[in-house]
C-alpha cells in the first residue's frame, strides 16, 4: 500500500480491500513453505539450513506458478472499462509480487532466526490427521466424478441466473444525512429519479416545446421543465433577464429537466431513458441525456461487457500459465475446469436463495476466486507429478499428493 503514494491515487474501495485480500491470498505461500520445511526437517533433523534450502526448492515451483496465476487474475481486472478494476488490479498484482518475494527471502530467514522460539511455543496440531479422509476420497474418485457432473447442471444454471443490483444507494446506512434527506424528498414529493437533457441552445422554442410535449407522453414521466415551458413560447428569449437565462442556458447548451416516477436501475426507467433518447435525437443529434438513471443504465452496459472480457482474459491467461508451468495441455483444462466449477457453485447459490448481489461482485469474485484458489490445485498437482517421477503408480501418487497437501490447503 505504501507504493501507491509513489505511483498514483487509489480509490477508497481499493484501500479498504487491498490489505485484507493481500493477506488472505499471499498467506498461502507462507503456509506452503512452512509445511515443506517441517517435512524436510524429518529428512534432515540435524541440519535446519539444509531442510530450509530443500523446502524453498520444493515449494518454489508451486509458489511461482500459483503467484503468477494469481497475478494474472488481478491483471485481468485491468481490462475493465470500469476504472475500479484497473485500480484494484494493479494494487493487488503488486501486492502478490511483493508477498512472494517476502515469502522466499524474508520468511525463511525469520524462521531460521526464531527457530528455537518456534519450537518452544509449538502446540499440539489442531488439524487432525487427514490420511483417512485422503484415502477415502481417492478410493471413491468415480463417485466424485459423477457428483461433479450432476451438480454442474444446477450450478451452471444458478451462475447464469443470479440477480444483481446497480443502485448502491440502497446499501448505505439509513442514518446518513444524505439518505435521510432523500427518503424525506421521496415521501413528500414522490421523487424517484430526475433526468436532464442538454440540447443545442439554438433550438427554436417551438421545437423545444414540441419535444417536451412528446416526452411528457412517455410512460412514467411525471413532468418536464425548461426555460420555454416556464415563460411560454410567446415571450422572446431576448426579453428574459440574463441572470435567469444563465441558470438553464449558455452559448452552447440549454438544460431541460424531466421528473420520473420510476426508480433508478429499474427495467422501467432504463426503457424510459431509451424512449426519451429517441425523441430528443430527432430534434438534436448531439443532445445528451444525463442524470443518475442514464448513468446507471450505461453502467449496466459497461459491466456486462466487462464481465465477459475479464472472464475470458483471466481464464485464458491462467490456462496458458499452467500449461507453461506443467508443460501439459490436459492439466490446465482439468485445473481451470475444477476451479470454474467451484465458482459456478459459489455464484449460483444466490440464485437459489433469492439473494441479490452488487453488480461488481460477479466480475471481481469470479476473477479473484479463480486466481487465488487455483493455487491449491497447483500445489497438489506439483506433488502428484513429483511422486510420479519417483516411480509411483497414479493411485499411490495421488494418494500421497492429497494427504501431504491437505494440511496446507
Where are these regions (language model features)?
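Membrane-embedded transmembrane helical bundles of large multi-pass transporters/channels
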Residues: 1-4, 8-166, 281-409
